[in-house]
Amino acid sequence: KHLVPFGEYVPARHVPIIKRIYTGMVGFIPEISPGDKPGIFQIDGERFLVLICFENIFPEISANLIDSNPGFIVVITNDSWYGNSFGPFQHFAHNILRACETGRYVVQVSSTGITGVVSPDGNCEMLQKNGEKLFIQGIMEMKIYPRSLNTLYMRLQEAGIAMIFIVLAGMCLCRV
């Protein structure tokens, strides 16, 4: 649903100067179209949401699941463009937020970067080899438990957070 700017699409690509500069640098203009519905899949009766690459940074994608009700979330990614930096760890950290917001397990499978599982309470298990978590090959086996509850965040989303801040601001003002 969300394309990577300059990797999967070029903003303002129809403006001649932008098209000329980008084509000169890369050799082509990517023309990928975003999906129009969530990637809900089902295996052995278990429904799950598939997020591609950086879609896990958008809370509204996973929070808007009340109707489709997947039991867990899978993120497939290739984080090689981050290199050996903090990037793959920061990208993986978004899964902690998504797991806590939705009350579901989040499984990230990465061809490069971090492969791991985040439980609904935010605990992480990552594929490791000799302490390394990046650019390793291996198999990770872990039991996950599909869940169907709708969390308070899924029901209220950003409005719930806004209400909390309004209440806190009111409490602070009343003390003054």
Per-segment meaning from a language model:
Residues 1-176:
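Enzyme catalytic cores with a strong preference for nitrogen-chemistry domains
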